[in-house]
Amino acid sequence: MILDKIIRYKKNKVKEEKVAVPLGEIMKQIEDMEEARNFKAALVGRESISMIAEVKKASPSKGIIKKDFNPVKIAAEYEKNRVDAISVLTEDQFFLGDNRYLQDIRKMTTIPLLRKDFMIDAYQIYQSKALGADAILLIAAALTKKEMIAFQKIAAEIGIYSLVEVHNKEELEMILETGAEIIGINNRDLKTFDTTLDRTAELLPFIPKDKIVVSESGIKTNQDMKLLKNYGINAVLMGEGLMRADSIGEKLRELRSGLCD
């Protein structure tokens, strides 16, 4: 399965990173860093649906998504079009991301940044803060309940937010027991990479009303956005649809059309 391959690769990658930049060095780096931007606040209180726009070059299922890929230029377009948060893929082997993308984007925008990667070691949480992330993605399919609790605690202690991702009811029940506040429903099955917005509709009734809900993956049209707004979700995370657009600005305007009526 793709997820298993990614996790195996990630474990080896993190071992190398720990040698290259020891945790003690990262801890020193984050001591004097500015307070994280409020990722949580960016996802609530909007008349429309909040937009987390993703900087994404490729994926295991689709290959290269954007050939002319300039992460800083893409982030600038997102800022110009007033997205609420930016997701930056840093996984290098399967998604062709890079930690430098996050660092470079941090320097040019004040929008809250989500580090999109596969967190399997506490080291990566501290690393995320040092790279400039305001929030991290924690994937239920990749973590035990014990790890999920510990990782959310570490993130909170160093002042960054956790977007906790689920794909099925079993994962949802597990993460609700860990106190997750921002819940992402991944419409894409990470084991098969099949995608359907029905996943959001199926899981939403089981999520307490005080949670912030983000629908992720498979969102392509204004009709999709209106459907998700009717479901009552707070935000969407969108990557491929924006990356494939001839004009990011025009695509965002199309997606948002009529949502504030």
From Swiss-Prot:
InterPro entries membership: Aldolase_TIM, Indole-3-glycerol_P_synth, Indole-3-glycerol_P_synth_dom, Indole-3-GlycerolPSynthase_CS, RibuloseP-bd_barrel
The UniProt record lists the keyword Ribonucleoprotein: no
Gene Ontology molecular function: indole-3-glycerol-phosphate synthase activity; phosphoribosylanthranilate isomerase activity
Pathway note: Amino-acid biosynthesis; L-tryptophan biosynthesis; L-tryptophan from chorismate: step 4/5
EC number(s) on file: 4.1.1.48
Source species, domain of life: Bacteria
Biological process (GO), any one: L-tryptophan biosynthetic process
Recorded catalytic activity of this chain's protein: 1-(2-carboxyphenylamino)-1-deoxy-D-ribulose 5-phosphate + H(+) = (1S,2R)-1-C-(indol-3-yl)glycerol 3-phosphate + CO2 + H2O
Keywords: Amino-acid biosynthesis, Aromatic amino acid biosynthesis, Decarboxylase, Lyase, Tryptophan biosynthesis
UniProt key word Phosphoprotein: no
Family under the similarity heading: Belongs to the TrpC family.
HAMAP family: IGPS_B (MF_00134_B)
Protein name: Indole-3-glycerol phosphate synthase
Gene: trpC
